[in-house]
Amino acid sequence: IHKGEGLVSEVFDKEKIKKLSGNAAIGHVRYSTAGGGGIMNVQPFLFRTLDGMMGIAHNGNIVNANSLKKELEENGSIFNSTSDTEVLGHLIKRETGRFVDRICKSLEKIDGAFAFVILVEDALYVARDRYGLRPLSMGRLPSGGYMFSSETCALDIAGAEYVRDVE
């Protein structure tokens, strides 16, 4: 994982990008609205789960994050940031069943306007709040891969063709 504060061009240069490996990634540029700034709140967040590693990034605001965080902490969860994004990771870790079902059960507990991207070893999951208040668009890359973004201009910059909005 590589992350830092500042503009993308300040955090990543060609050398750092060359060192990255794999066929999937989460990128995130944060405008601090909840949880404050600082390196501890820079996304994506990485979680170790019984199923392996899980990365999460999100755009939006979880309005019941404080009450969920309090409940999770009372049950043993340890938070490493003040970001509301981290709440979803802890909720998913507490659920049982198939991974996709754990995500769905966790999202049912969250109130607010949001779009999430969740990356695990063999899959990428995306989700929006039940009212679709936060944008999330899907694009197809020239290589045949896919990307998701909260702004279609990011698809254009990456050379991806807009496919549709996530519902």
Model-found features: residue ranges?
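Conserved short alpha-helical segments that host acidic/polar catalytic motifs at enzyme active sites
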Residues: 1-166
